[in-house]
Amino acid sequence: MEQKDSRFAVLIDADNVSPKYIKYILDEVSDQGVATYKRIYGDWTDISKKSWKEQLLRYSINPIQQYSNTNGKNSTDSAMIIDAMDILYSGNVEGFCLVSSDSDFTKLAQRLRESGMFVLGMGEQKTPSSFRVACDAFKILEIISQNEDDISPAITAVSENPARYGTSQDETPFHYKQGRNRTDGFPCTDREQ
């Protein structure tokens, strides 16, 4: 399977990402494969979510309504996690793109990887390292939006966890190897050379 044939589920936490990044998120996913699922989770009755409408229509993203049941509790995260597990067990994708700037999806990223899924994480610079290192690759939205054509700096060296990749702190743990892909179509890591 070629890399561009890989099917992805793109799941976005609207509470922790700005709508200005949607184009860049989808461009990055299209470099990896096809966005089979495009879902975004939030309480769409909240006036602060009004700015999302134009982007959702433009990019055909399915908004998933999740009311805030209790003040201070985030039911959006639970809905996104349940959907991710349903998609995982459907067998319809080879990878997930989890977009959030908080650590609530760390365990989900770990679980998806354990099931053999490629996990691409995206978030703002404030994203905690626990979520970053749980993903196979993590891209910082501020960086990819600054220079869409040059994505190499956006693949962050997840240096907080060098042992996972068998590299030292100074090496980039995840990078593309031209002409050397795994059999599943995803780029090799240093460990897989």
Protein language model annotation of sequence segments:
Residues Q110-P153:
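Intrinsically disordered, low-complexity glycine/proline-rich and charged
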Residues I22, K49, F105-T106, T127-S129:
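Short, well-ordered alpha-helical microsegments
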Residues N62, D86-N92, L141-D149, V158:
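A polyampholytic, Gly/Pro-enriched intrinsically disordered region
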Residues A14, S68-N69, S101, E124-Q125, ...:
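Short, ordered loop/turn segments at secondary-structure junctions
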Residues M1-Y89, Q110, F118:
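Domain-level signal for Mg2+-assisted phosphodiester chemistry and nucleotide/NA-binding surfaces
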Residues Y37-R39, G95, A137:
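Residues at the N-termini of beta-strands
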Residues A154-Q193:
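N-terminal regulatory modules in eukaryotic regulatory proteins
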Residues Y41, E94-S101, L108, L112, ...:
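Acidic beta-strand-to-loop metal/phosphate-binding motif
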